[in-house]
Amino acid sequence: MIMKLSDIKNGNLSAEWAEKGYELPKFDIEAVKAKTHAEPTWVHFGAGNIFRAFPAAVLNDALNSGKYDRGVIVAESFDYEIIDKAYQPYDNLSLLVCLKSTGDIEKKVIASVTESLKADYSFGADWARLVEIFQAPSLQMISFTITEKGYGVAPADLERGLTPVLAMGKVTALLYERFKAGKLPLTVQSMDNCSHNGDKVKAAVFAYASKWVEQGLVPAEFLAYVKDETKITFPWSMIDKITPRPDAKVQKMLADDGFEDNYTIVTEKHTFTAPFVNAEETQYLCIEDHYTNGRPPLELGGVLYCDRETVDKIEKMKVCTCLNPLHTAMSIYGCMLGYTLISAEMADEDLRSFIQKIGYIEAMPVVVDPGVLNPYEFIGAVINRRLPNPFMPDAPQRIATDTSQKLAIRFGETIKAYEARGLDKSNLILIPLVLAGYARYLTGLDDNGQPFEISTDPLLAELQAIVAPLKVEAGEQDFSCLKALYSRTDVFGVDLYAVGLGEKIESMAKELFAGPGAVRATLHKYVKAR
């Protein structure tokens, strides 16, 4: 049997698809489409894989519950080929392939996207439709997965008047249409993986609105409108889900099923997309519940709504304790030990114990507990399900990018918390070992003494110059150069000597530099002792 997304019409193929393990929508697709077209409630900017795998899938679950009846309209402001090649040929349907660490796979057709539009003035009909949607009193929320860079504001774009080319400029132009339609309320919601993401959207919108007022292009009341929290809000959120580019193994599995829409699409802008999207099973989306015109009931699909302080606590729990520090520890040592997959590292007993003990023994005593998510359950999912997942082709080399910019938040905050609470810092053994490993990593030599490619980093040349006098060899060396590294508060968040850890880290670094095999031997020694 050949299966194609375009064949799906309100579940009349359900028996055939179910035989192959494909879950079809339980709602009337055409009815939801018609209702959404007439009374739109949600527009999402960013038509990439994370949107289809997470926000759109959450809404699909809400629609399947029978307790909601509107879909989401997706708008793409950067790579318009995604709309032409991955959405419209398939009636805006897509297949979500959920990859579990057990090796099990779930396949679900996502039908919550009712329209797909190119967010640019050069596409006249699409832009006119976006203006019409923004003028609709029914519109409750616009949201984004455009990456942190998407919130950038370029001086040149601010000079383009009411036809900017960057995403935030276009959104501000559409907000101006909503202002002219009667100062209608709306919530502007970032769903990107960056701290205090709502503030990034807010700053960008305010920048455009302020400039346009200054240039006399819009009335001062427009700036007052976007700043009025009874009209426009910019809530924070925390999102966490890994959605890799389309995977060849998944592609083959779908082809073997007879699912015809299984090919990868690479756009001219080098976006990797497909009619299907593969993603990990674990996911978290926590949103500050600060809406001015109502909102879609995404809690029906598992979204957690809370206050701003709680969103911030969840972010800190993840970034400072339960996920990001473990990632960085694995990236530094994984690169030196020759690994290219995080999942493969999890089969290495030394590395697995390394991150378990960093998380549970050293970081957890000062974890920020948000109350609504259990830190122990969160880190348990990371260690037992997420990192070992063989379907997640994540590499230590990717995670090692910009390490100098990550160490302060991922480890420095824990050290500061030990200081603030008067805890005994001599209990910190493996976190110092991570930081000692960073000096060894900067040499660009693996544990066999062979060169490896160090990931890009803005401070790379500067920090490599500090460790340049050191050799990876047995025998006496002068390690005093490390003082210039480990006293840098810009890199580590604290002066490691001032907090009493510098000498311990230096001592560990000496062991790591003691010739080929020293990285493995030192790691094993300290992990076992812990």
Regions found by a protein language model. Name each.
Residues 2-45, 49-530:
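Substrate/ligand-engaging "lid" and interaction regions
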